């Protein structure tokens, strides 16, 4: 897959997909109740739109209904799925699962994948330790496993950093505050925990602290205090895909559904 950016998608065999679904059915209810409320990726009743609306709700709270400046720290993890440390993930799972048969299966599933990251993309600390890395993007179990992995960070954020306004969707997460210095103080702790506990690194080009009024790019939309607009790159991709499609095609309808969640009246007219 190369749209919107190159990604390695690994499609399991039919037999393996059945196994992944069976494992997910057993593990999801157990782990989902351990996740924080504001983790929104690949969870029942969550999703991108719920994450965006929670972001808006927190923005209103931290700005006292938009009467004060709202600052946002936006972070993105570099090469997320390919950088998951398999040893650390298995240690987390072993702390929470007592069934040895399930653990054996998880060892087999996780250990069967090897990341195709080039040496320059692997963080220095991971190269030094020669850690087995990566989860296959495309497997149902991978979506759950990365949530289990990042739950370590979520719990740290809520219980150690005491962050009040925090939203995460997969490898994208934001912190909100009326005090810019508060976010600046949080930032080094975020870097250190991700590096030392999870062996993950932030993407240097996708981290910023800015005001909500200046526009915050999060989950494909640029958010402002009273509205959101579609990100330019997302807009171009949408037009490229729909230019030769009928208005009632499934792809066009899915985009129209997405556009309902922002200020997109003119865009909708162009799609139909």
List each model region and its residues.
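Conserved polymerase palm-domain catalytic core
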Residues: 38, 58-170, 174-190, 201, ...
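Acidic, glycine-rich two-metal-ion catalytic cores of nucleic acid-processing enzymes
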Residues: 14-18
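Active/ligand-binding-proximal structured segments within catalytic/core domains
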Residues: 23-27
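Right-hand nucleic-acid polymerase module
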Residues: 21, 126-132, 181-185, 202-272
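Long, hydrophobic, well-ordered secondary-structure blocks that form the structural core
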Residues: 41-52
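Conserved phosphate-binding loops in nucleotide/dinucleotide-binding enzymes
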Residues: 8-13
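Charged boundary/loop elements
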Residues: 29-38
């Amino acid at each position: 897959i190369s749209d919107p950016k190159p990604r390695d998608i690994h499609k399991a065999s039919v037999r393996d997909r059945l196994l992944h679904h069976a494992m997910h059915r057993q593990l999801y209810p157990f782990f989902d109740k351990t996740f924080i409320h504001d983790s929104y990726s690949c969870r029942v009743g969550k999703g991108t739109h719920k994450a965006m609306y929670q972001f808006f709700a927190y923005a209103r709270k931290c700005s006292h209904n938009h009467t004060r400046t709202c600052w946002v720290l936006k972070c993105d993890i570099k090469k997320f799925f390919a950088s998951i440390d398999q040893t650390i993930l298995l240690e987390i799972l072993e702390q929470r699962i007592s069934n040895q048969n399930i653990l054996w299966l998880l060892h087999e599933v996780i250990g069967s994948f090897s990341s195709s990251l080039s040496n320059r993309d692997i963080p220095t600390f991971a190269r030094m330790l020669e850690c087995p890395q990566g989860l296959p993007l495309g497997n149902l179990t991978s979506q759950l496993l990365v949530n289990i992995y990042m739950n370590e960070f979520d719990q740290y954020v809520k219980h150690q950093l005491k962050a009040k306004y925090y939203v995460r969707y997969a490898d994208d997460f934001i912190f909100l505050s009326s005090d810019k210095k508060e976010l600046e103080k949080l930032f080094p702790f975020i870097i250190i925990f991700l590096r030392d506990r999870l062996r993950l690194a932030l993407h240097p080009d996708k981290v910023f602290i800015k005001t909500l009024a200046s526009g915050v790019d999060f989950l494909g939309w640029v958010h402002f205090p009273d509205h959101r607009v579609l990100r330019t790159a997302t807009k171009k991709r949408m037009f490229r895909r729909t230019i030769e499609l009928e208005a009632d095609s499934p792809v066009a309808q899915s985009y129209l559904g997405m556009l309902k969640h922002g200020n997109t009246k003119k865009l909708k007219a162009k799609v139909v």
